[in-house]
Each structure stands twice: as structure tokens, then as C-alpha cells.
């Protein structure tokens, strides 16, 4: 069994906008690849501090390549020690893809590499997943499950947990639980 700490990203600009604008906030170009709000940064920092109390070290960190998740991961890593060669981005951790939700359109790989050189982007294809259009829940569950099954094999026997930072719907599909911003669940899989 591998211990996973599954974290939803902190509050993003699109989450804040959705409180006043509703679902149209997700399609607003100003929220493309939404960044964390000031509140979201504080939430991510607090999650890192809380995680560190029980697990000061992690075996690895895997993260969605969307900016809000990377920012959440960076703030968690301010508290939790993660080996520099074990910090990864993976498209399987993206939020459920919907053609109109530009908040879930990630940056190009070259831009991600320039902005976040500490992350291994070998598992992020040049072409983003949003071109596929509407993604059904069972497809999200399948891609998340495939990655988790792979990580269970890779990290079998690990002493410290593996941290995964991603999105509400992606986590819901595998956990059956909706997490608030920067909430996390510890699961042995």
C-alpha cells in the first residue's frame, strides 16, 4: 500500500469569480489557466503547514500542470520536504475538460518549463487535452485511476507519502468526495 495525500488546489480566480458570476466565470478568458487568489495562496500555505505536522517529508509530488495547482504545490513544498528529482506534472491530473471552460486550459509546455523549471514535464504532452472537447466523468475516473495504479507500483514500499495536487472533479471521480479549496484526504491505496 502507498500512502497518498490528495490535495485540491487553493482558491483560484475562477472560483472567486464564480461566486458572483456563476458558471460563466469558467468560460471568461480572463480566467484562462486561473491563478490562485491571495486567499488561495494562504490556503495552500496552511495546507503545507498542516501536512508537515504529520509528514515533514514526501517521497514525491505529482501535480496537474494548471497554474493554480502548481502554485498550490509550491506553497505546500515551502513546508514539506520533497526530493528535487521527484516533482512531476502530469496531464492525467487535469480537471475535467469542457470545451467552454477556459479556466482549465493549461499553458504550453515551453511556457510551463520556463515558469516552473523545478517541475519535471516529461509527462505533459505538447498538445493540451482541451482540444478533445467535453470529457465525461467516467473518462476522468479512468485517467485518474490509471495514473494512481501506476504510482502505486512505482512507489510500492515507500516510507513517506506521495502528494498529489489536482482538482475537485478529478478527485471526486476517484474518491467520491468533494473537497473544498486546499482540502486534502489521506488514502492508502
Give residue ranges: language-model regions.
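Short active-site segment of divalent metal-dependent hydrolases/proteases
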Residues: 12, 170-171
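A short, structured active-site edge motif that brings together acidic residues
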Residues: 65, 83-103, 124-131
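A short, acidic, amphipathic alpha-helical segment used as a generic capping/interface helix at domain edges
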Residues: 140-156
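Active-site-proximal alpha-helix that buttresses catalytic centers in soluble enzyme cores
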Residues: 2-85, 98, 119, 182-185
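Acidic, low-complexity terminal tails and accessory targeting/binding regions
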Residues: 1-4, 16-17, 22, 47, ...
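Conserved AMP-binding/adenylate-forming core of the ANL superfamily
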Residues: 36-41, 134-141
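Short glycine/proline- and acidic residue-enriched helix-loop micro-motifs
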Residues: 30, 114-136
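Beta-strand elements within well-structured catalytic alpha/beta cores of enzymes
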Residues: 3-7, 62, 160-170
Amino acid at each position: 500500500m502507498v500512502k497518498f495525500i490528495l490535495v485540491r488546489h487553493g482558491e483560484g480566480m475562477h472560483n472567486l469569480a464564480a461566486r458572483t458570476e456563476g458558471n460563466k466565470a469558467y468560460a471568461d478568458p480572463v480566467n484562462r489557466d486561473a491563478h490562485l487568489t491571495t486567499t488561495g495562496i494562504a490556503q495552500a500555505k496552511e495546507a503545507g503547514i498542516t501536512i508537515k505536522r504529520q509528514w515533514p517529508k514526501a517521497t514525491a509530488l505529482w501535480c496537474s500542470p494548471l497554474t493554480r495547482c502548481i502554485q498550490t504545490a509550491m506553497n505546500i513544498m515551502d513546508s514539506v520536504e520533497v526530493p528535487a528529482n521527484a516533482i512531476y506534472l502530469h496531464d492525467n491530473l487535469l480537471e475535467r475538460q469542457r470545451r467552454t471552460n477556459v479556466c482549465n486550459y493549461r499553458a504550453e509546455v515551453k511556457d510551463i518549463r520556463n515558469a516552473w523549471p523545478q517541475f519535471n514535464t516529461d509527462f505533459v504532452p505538447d498538445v493540451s487535452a482541451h482540444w478533445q472537447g467535453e470529457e465525461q466523468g467516467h473518462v476522468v475516473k479512468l485517467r485518474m485511476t490509471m495514473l494512481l495504479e501506476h504510482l502505486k507500483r512505482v512507489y510500492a514500499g515507500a516510507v513517506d507519502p506521495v502528494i498529489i495536487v489536482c482538482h475537485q472533479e478529478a478527485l471526486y471521480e476517484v474518491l467520491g468526495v468533494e473537497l473544498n479549496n486546499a482540502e486534502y484526504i489521506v488514502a492508502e491505496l
